[in-house]
């Protein structure tokens, strides 16, 4: 049995941050009921990040809402609101990621919900916290990356700000929310008291940069300096980066420069004998290294570096990755199906418990597909 098999989560969240949290709780065995607007559902159903349409809706929605139920309710109507409150009364966890003030207007803020269910863990994600000048701004991932300094850590020195190609702040906030929820559920087991868990996307982005921000303050407030070429980390010296080869790319992490020079047959690198050179002269070193690595194939260099325990790797595209034994041996994919029979392939939960991988064959819910079942449960005496 999965560890959260007896837990009920009522999820009002939209987009990615909140749903990523409820997805992980579902992976761990919780029953997750999405509360959606009648007729249209959550906005994520029509949030297209590509031209891929899955069963008439967004691929994003289907990827992040597998193994959940859908219950439609108009929270502005008293009858529907009362039904939702009955559902909350049975729940262990409630999640939302509306802007500050929305749940207060609906009468579903923490102070009201704790009256309905004193033992509930009430979990919320905001963009910028509940106070401050940015409080009411839209909590969108690219905006958060831009406001928190993340965009100045990727790319080369002349590139300007470069955002990450994934909704990283959404995922970080969702992961932090799950940690808070699980901690409060553990605490509730001894106190039987509910709790309020609050996470903001902006604080999650700051926490993600704890290493860089700590260095910034200790370094006299100097801004991070990306290398001119092959940058992969603003605070690390050469050879750290990704380099083009004859037929692809090679990732190189840490390594003593003279040792690399000997192994690769590049005499020019052997001149950088001081440890400080790796950082102070990293642009020079990377230029020399880049020109040399273009002379051989990726596998040629890997065959030299890997036996010497140099930290390096091929740079795989998804099509190559999915065929590689390193990926297939993990059994990272699973096939899931919606109630109408629509099937799709997606990733599984990355957590193992007692050596067992966590799978679920249940796909994402059609809008309101579980209304009948849930209404029956709520009206049973």
What positions do the PLM features span?
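N-terminal helix-loop segment corresponding to the beta1-alpha1 unit
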Residues: 1-193, 225, 366, 370-381
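Glycine-rich beta-alpha junction loops
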Residues: 39, 128-129, 201-206, 247-249, ...
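Short Gly/Pro-enriched turn/cap motifs at secondary-structure boundaries
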Residues: 61, 224-225, 229-235, 240-241, ...
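A short glycine-threonine-serine/GTX helix/turn-capping micro-motif
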Residues: 161-172, 194-196, 227-231, 238-240, ...
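Oxidoreductase and adenylate-handling cofactor-binding alpha/beta cores
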Residues: 174-194, 207-221, 262-268
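Aromatic-enriched alpha-helical interface/lid elements that frame and gate functional surfaces
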Residues: 233-308, 312
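Conserved PLP cofactor-binding pocket of PLP-dependent enzymes
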Residues: 306-330
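Flexible, small-/acidic-enriched active-site or ligand-binding loops
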Residues: 338-381
